Amino acid sequence: MPSNCAENWNKQSGIPYGMAFYKNSYVGRTFIKPKQSQRESSVKIKLNVIEEVVRDNRIVMVDDSIVRGTTCANIIKMLKRAGAKEVHVRISSPPFLYSCYFGTDVPSNEQLIAHSRTTEEIRELIGADSLGYMEIDKLKNMVGSLGYCDACFTGNYPMEVPGRDISHAFE
């Protein structure tokens, strides 16, 4: 959970900001692990809930994206086990709907939690009390004329992409 996203969200919302986890900095990005079991165990190793901060509180968790949903769902379970009354999730990007062929290790659309689900369906799957994403238009307004690839959000790729299933390439 990038702290700059959470800190900026805190400034805009006025909701108090605090750290709810001890983070093991030696564990890298969990969503890019090749197997589901590795992704799940990595989350448990990477983050330890600070129960005194979480217990009996409503938590707003801010993250940069939801790819498969594994990390987010496990974190929500950890927070609720630690006594959080509610866990609300805010994502600082639009839903990740399409495979990225230019840098993110996501081999197929079917592995993306948002590809064929509504926000409400995702909210239920991950166990959040509410879920909100940044709108694509707001993201475009923020970056202005800098230009960037938004294919993972829109499906509009800047060039021809592989037509083959690459889902086994990372196993």
Predicted stretch roles:
Residues M1-E171:
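PRPP-associated nucleotide enzymes
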